[in-house]
């Protein structure tokens, strides 16, 4: 009996304590809400994509910290809200909803895979918030609430193919990719582009492998066989994530040198190379809009800040990090111009905003919510960095609707009033997608 | 000033072209250029664009000067620098933040200067090819047979008719039969590309077809459409070579299959003990493999830091450690969680799956989500050719290692008191207990053994796989597949199952593609299990039936 009483007493006490704590916390967060502008970070910190996305969370935290040191935004401090969608695509949508409706963030920086982006699109539309998406993707999309700071196919894939053709004299193409939406769409565009350039269908080989594929012996030997038809052959790789490391190892093992069959990759950056001995890979290529090896004072500053932030002299920077750098600065500038973090005002103010990128130019936000970027082609070096061998003379604006695909070549996107349409068909004169 | 220099250099290149052409025609034995001439040509390498650099390389090669090969070699390796202010081209060797400089012409050491004052001369693949061809032509008469062979191979790739005089000179001097053959093949390739007589070309086709490999196929295919005899001969030769290649391909598929099978065997063999012998559905098995791979990483890290000389032995040191670490974690899991769940397979499955997530995240928090670099010791890098099959050392060692682990485990279970007790507990727990066997202790040790074996599998897999927290996930399904297919509780079944699946996969892959191939294998296993639920080699016995 007495023990029962103790328990009841304890429970009441605990309850009262919890109530008080909750009250305090609510008050505290109410207070904080008045003082800070919240920025949501939606990157996987666990699961398969953690390998790529963790650094993006860190770079956002660093950028926010730097902005706060400069005095914050609109006289308020920025506050990062980090959530972990755990590489689980539906969870991205839930976490996005949590960020926007519960935490009241002004903008969200996040997503990596296209499928995660597709899963959060309806949430951003419904709750009218702003998403900055920092990764190269397949195009064929333009949403009012999304700002695409990574490359569209015309800012990466097509210039890379042009380079190989002009500089290396490639006539035979292997399009190798991981089996999901980004490689499949990119390869469809590339195939149409190559056929339009007069490449014979038998000179194109398309190959897909599952995520995390690790036994590349057969495919690499197939590539070798395909490459012995007397024409210069190259591999265009949209292989994503972990699978790249064993792929490159196998290339090295089977003695395929870059001078014989070069591989140009769209998803391999400094971060991915950090896990391999790159000596056998020297000369293989990657196309990006930024490399750590870009020689520019702003880039040097950024790399130094990043190394200091990570506390590691070996920390590397890569293209999606630059995309976040550009996106974050664009958002800051647009908020300052609009004088508010209100989504509608910021979305309008973002179009036309120009900020310095890390390769010595200014990137600006186009009316189609894609940005202008230089296209760089780099060759892998033995220290895991890229030597830039080609750079477009000017900046290229992302083209969301590919000109080489049936059904998307007539579409344009312009989010400025009065058109305000993401898929305007110039032939039918109607907003509403593919004809 | 610098503009005039550029102009002058360009002029010198053009002139040298002409002069060198004459020289090549008139006197095959190359004359030595003066230092000043050579210096101008070398400085021209630091041109603005790749095409200009290519011209400069060709001009340098035309001099035939024996100092040129070293300069071009340095350029190919990225060791050639140009001073930011002096515009002088030098050979540099990085030493910390400084460069140790050598004069490219006189080979004299110039001194050490900060690397910031110099820019590396960039090369791309096209230039690398040009450099190799140039060095090839220059070193055909080298004293070193390895260099001569490499030179002949490089010249072969150029198929440049202008190399024929140089090749003829080299063929006349050559004594080594192997290198002589490569040189003759290189000459044949050049002849095919020249405007030689038809009979010469047909002979050249025969020479090249003699190689019977992909390189020859790649050359011959280009002449199929040639008019007259040449086209006919080329077509016949291509057909011949294709037949040879098809045969080798079958052999290659078997080798690839054995190699994949050995990887599957390594991954599954620990599970064959924990799941096969003990009946525990251990979803954290893959994480034991992952922990073994991380142990290798840590061992290599320590070796790099404290004893770089021992690097070649890093895997041998990592093996026992990985066994102990993974085994100890296995014992802890068995004592801490699994022993409370015996006889409740669903709960065991969920609990071990939870443990696998915990282990993954723990590794991710400690080491980061990025891949860790695990190096290959020198005896595991590279490959050698058997006919047209290139066998990589790492795969070969993994096959050997998998077989070794298999037989060691077999011996342990069949020939030692511990093995006897384990089998007794598996066969009939009550009776074993009544005979005085400490069954809980045997449970813990057997689980530890299975986990430890998974750990050493991780050491081997670290050589061909990404060492990341997700390493194990990729293997868990495959491992269960192998064990179930081979027959639960039977190590031989695991061996046969792994090799069958490996080879089947590799024969399907060229036709069906990697994605479909895997699906076919899965469908096959599902059908097979319907027919024979106990797998290939079913154990018979009273307790098993119960």
Residue positions per predicted region:
Chain A
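Solvent-exposed, acidic/polar segments of extracytosolic/periplasmic ligand-binding ectodomains
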Residues: 37, 354-435
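Extracellular/periplasmic periplasmic-binding protein-like sensory domains
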Residues: 250-325, 335-341, 392-423, 427-428
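Extracellular/periplasmic Venus flytrap/periplasmic-binding protein
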Residues: 94, 138-139, 145-254, 293-301, ...
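Periplasmic-binding protein-like
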Residues: 99-111, 132-134, 172-177, 230-241, ...
């Amino acid at each position: 009996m007495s023990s029962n009483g103790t328990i009841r007493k304890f429970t009441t006490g605990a309850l009262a304590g919890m109530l008080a704590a909750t009250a305090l916390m609510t008050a505290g967060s109410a207070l904080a809400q008045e003082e800070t502008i919240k920025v949501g970070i939606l990157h996987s910190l666990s699961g398969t994509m953690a390998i790529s996305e963790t650094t993006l969370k860190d770079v956002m935290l660093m950028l926010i910290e730097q902005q706060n040191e400069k005095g914050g935004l609109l006289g308020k401090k920025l506050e990062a809200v980090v959530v972990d969608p755990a590489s689980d695509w539906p969870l991205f949508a839930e976490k996005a909803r949590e960020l926007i409706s519960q935490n009241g963030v002004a903008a969200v920086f996040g997503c990596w895979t296209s499928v995660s982006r597709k899963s959060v699109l309806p949430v951003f539309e419904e709750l009218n918030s702003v998403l900055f998406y920092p990764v190269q993707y397949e195009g064929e999309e333009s949403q009012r609430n999304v700002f695409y700071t990574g490359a569209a196919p015309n800012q990466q894939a097509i210039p890379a193919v042009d380079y190989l053709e002009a500089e290396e004299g490639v006539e035979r193409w292997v399009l190798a990719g991981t089996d999901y939406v980004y490689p499949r769409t990119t390869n469809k565009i590339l195939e149409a582009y190559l056929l339009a350039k007069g490449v014979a269908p038998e000179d194109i080989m398309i190959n897909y492998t599952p995520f995390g594929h690790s036994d590349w012996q057969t495919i690499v030997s197939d590539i070798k066989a395909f490459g012995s038809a007397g024409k210069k052959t190259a591999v265009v790789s949209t292989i994503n994530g972990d699978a790249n490391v064993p792929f490159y190892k196998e290339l090295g093992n089977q003695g395929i040198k870059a001078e014989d069959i070069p591989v140009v990759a769209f998803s391999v950056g400094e971060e991915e190379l950090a896990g391999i001995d790159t000596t056998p890979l020297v000369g293989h290529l990657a196309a990006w809009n930024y490399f750590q090896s870009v020689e520019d004072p702003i880039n040097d500053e950024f790399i130094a800040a990043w190394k200091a932030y990570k506390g590691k002299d070996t920390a590397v920077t890569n293209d999606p990090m630059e995309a976040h750098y550009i996106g974050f600065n664009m958002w800051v500038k647009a908020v300052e111009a609009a004088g508010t973090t209100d989504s509608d005002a910021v979305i309008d103010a973002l179009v036309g905003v120009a900020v310095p990128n890390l390769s010595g130019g200014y990137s600006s936000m186009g009316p189609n919510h894609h940005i202008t970027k230089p296209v760089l082609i780099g060759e892998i070096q033995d220290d895991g960095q890229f030597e830039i061998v080609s750079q477009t003379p000017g900046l290229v604006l992302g083209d969301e609707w590919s000109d080489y695909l049936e059904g998307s070549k007539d579409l344009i996107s312009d989010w400025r009033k009065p058109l305000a349409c993401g898929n305007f068909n110039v032939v039918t004169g109607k907003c509403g997608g593919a004809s | 000033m610098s503009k005039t220099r550029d102009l002058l250099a360009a002029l010198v290149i053009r002139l040298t072209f002409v002069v060198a052409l004459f020289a090549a025609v008139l006197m095959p034995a190359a004359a030595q250029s003066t230092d000043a001439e050579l210096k101008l040509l070398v400085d021209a390498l630091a041109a603005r664009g790749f095409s200009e650099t290519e011209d400069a390389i060709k001009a340098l090669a035309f001099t035939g000067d024996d100092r040129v090969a070293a300069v071009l070699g340095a350029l190919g390796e990225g060791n050639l620098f140009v001073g930011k202010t002096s515009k002088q081209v030098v050979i540099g060797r990085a030493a910390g933040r400084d460069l140790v400089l050598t004069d490219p012409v006189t080979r004299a050491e110039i001194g050490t200067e900060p690397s910031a004052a110099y820019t590396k001369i960039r090369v791309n693949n096209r230039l690398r090819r040009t450099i190799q061809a140039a060095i090839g032509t220059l070193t055909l008469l080298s004293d070193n047979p390895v260099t001569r062979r490499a030179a002949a191979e490089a010249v072969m790739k150029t198929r440049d008719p202008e190399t024929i005089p140089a090749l003829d000179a080299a063929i006349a001097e050559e004594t080594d039969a192997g290198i002589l053959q490569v040189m003759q093949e290189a000459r044949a390739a050049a002849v095919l590309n020249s405007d030689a007589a038809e009979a010469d070309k047909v002979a050249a086709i025969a020479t090249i077809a003699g190689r019977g490999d992909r390189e020859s196929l790649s050359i011959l295919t280009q002449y199929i459409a040639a008019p007259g005899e040449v086209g006919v001969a080329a077509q016949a030769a291509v057909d011949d070579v294709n037949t040879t290649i098809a045969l080798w391909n079958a052999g290659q598929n078997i080798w690839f299959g054995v190699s994949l099978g050995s990887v599957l065997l390594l991954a599954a063999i620990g599970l064959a003990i924990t799941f096969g012998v003990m009946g525990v559905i251990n979803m954290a098995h893959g994480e034991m493999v992952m922990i073994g791979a991380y142990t290798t990483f840590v061992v290599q890290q320590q070796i790099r830091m404290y004893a770089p000389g021992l690097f070649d032995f890093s895997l041998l040191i990592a093996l026992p450690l990985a066994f102990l670490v993974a085994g100890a974690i296995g014992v802890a899991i068995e004592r801490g969680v699994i022993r409370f769940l015996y006889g409740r397979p669903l709960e065991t499955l969920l609990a071990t799956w939870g443990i696998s997530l915990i282990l993954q995240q723990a590794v991710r928090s400690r080491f980061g989500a990025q891949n860790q670099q695990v190096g290959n010791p020198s005896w595991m890098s590279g490959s050698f050719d058997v006919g047209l099959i290139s066998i990589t050392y790492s795969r070969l060692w993994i096959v050997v290692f998998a077989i070794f682990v298999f037989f060691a485990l077999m011996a342990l279970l069949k020939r030692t008191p511990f093995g006897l007790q384990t089998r007794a507990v598996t066969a009939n727990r009550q009776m074993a207990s009544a005979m005085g066997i400490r069954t809980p202790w045997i449970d813990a040790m057997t689980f530890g053994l299975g986990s430890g074996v998974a750990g050493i599998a991780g050491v081997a897999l670290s050589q061909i796989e990404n060492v990341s927290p997700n390493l194990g996930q990729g293997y868990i399904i495959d491992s269960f597949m192998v064990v179930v297919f081979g027959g639960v509780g039977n190590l031989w079944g695991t061996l046969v199952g792994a090799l069958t699946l490996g080879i089947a996969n590799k024969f399907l892959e060229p036709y069906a593609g990697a994605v479909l191939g895997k699906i076919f294998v899965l469908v096959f296993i599902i059908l097979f299990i319907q027919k024979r639920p106990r797998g290939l080699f079913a154990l018979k016995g009273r307790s098993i039936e119960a």
